[in-house]
Amino acid sequence: MKPGDHYITNDPWLTSGHLHDITVVTPSFYRGEPVGLFANTIHVVDIGGLGMGPDGRQVFEEGLAIPIMPLAREGRMNEDLLHLVRANVREPLQVEGDIYACAACNDEGSRRLIAMMDEFEIANLDRLGETIIDASREATLARIRALPHGIYKNSLTMDGYDKPLILNAAMAISDDGIHVDFDGTSPASSYGINVVYNYCLAYTAFGVKCLVAPEVPNNAGSLAPITVSAPEGCVLNVKRPWPVAARHTVGHMLPDVVFGCLHQVMSGGVPAEGASSLWNPQIFGGGSLVDDVDEGTDANSLPQFSTVIFHCGGAGARPEKDGLSATAFPSGVRTIPIEATESVAPVLFYRREFREGSGGAGKFRGGLGQVIELGGACATPLALLCNFERVRNPARGRNGGQAGAAGKVTLRSGRPIRPKGRQTVPPRDAIRLELPGGGGFGDPRERDPERVRDDLLDGMITANDARRDYGVVVDKHGRIDLTETNRLRALRPPK
């Protein structure tokens, strides 16, 4: 390695779990000696192949694979590689620009590191790194050792592609750390919703750390006490060449699984289940990709494009707070403004709003999902790769809280749509996405009536929700009917 070198790969089994995520790694040098590596991962809008959907039966169908190889040597970009990438993706300028951005990001990180080392007269990072990693490991272990030791189990059923999947977890807590074993989890799917081991490890460890040691910095030391095993060949540990393009569909459920284990040992409770898995369809245009074209329209004249939208349902209610609405947990991905999508592709959003009544009822309400309607601008037909979970198995509540609303997918015209796989939105029609809500926490009859009224006035729930789930009646002037509310709550007091 030399200054100015950059390395690139999108190998799912080495990095982020599917071909759409490209990782760039850059060595950093101080006074001619290597002192560290900077790395970042970016989700590109397209990587060729079938796209970011679950329809592929092997990873070879899912796009262009880039093994670990030089992106640049001593500051000179590998033009042959970039030419190959541009030739294999539907949006070459965007993808190439993203790759350059990754390299620039690492370069900026390296410049700041060197400036810090100059300022504090640090020759290398060995002792500093060891100190941080050792301290972080001990801090995480201290939190783990304070928990009741034992083995705690939880199971979660999810929709799957064509049949339900079961994620089984057994969490062993000891002085040595936390080990999560996924023995008993469903076998691998024939479709691209499978998870590679490193992605399983990452989201399992993240779920544990969120609750056990959230304030400890993320590094090799703080994560070392959290270990994971998953049987080879199960949906959480597939080997090449099994399909993995939509691996987030399953992987994003893992924190909910481990939360269910930790709920049994954490006295303050843990959040209820949330929508968890992103609803992020890839949207295509082009005459060869759509099934519905107006009579008399030349299919060759339809615009060719590819884009991805990221949207999310509601998060689970917390032990002392309502769940966050339309918020991506555990991924942390920010929702793309609809104006940004409309500016880069012939896509038109007709509606985007909170989904009334979708948050699970509870002393603390689950976060709301959202309703989104979109179609092609100027009567353009669209092809979508759908990866929608929580349609048949909604997010469960906790401590007496109710489940969030299940997701729903339809066309505005009424034609049914499958929640997973390639679909077509005809000209002048629109797909309607009703994203799932998060589960509630605690008995709904314990919720402060004032908060129920506020939810009603804010359009978060309906009057029927307030009466049926919470035992709260609000008159036409927005005032709580205390007599009727007390009567309803007396009929079914909190458990």
List the model feature ranges, each with a label:
Residues 1-495:
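Glycine/proline-enriched, intrinsically flexible loops and inter-domain linkers
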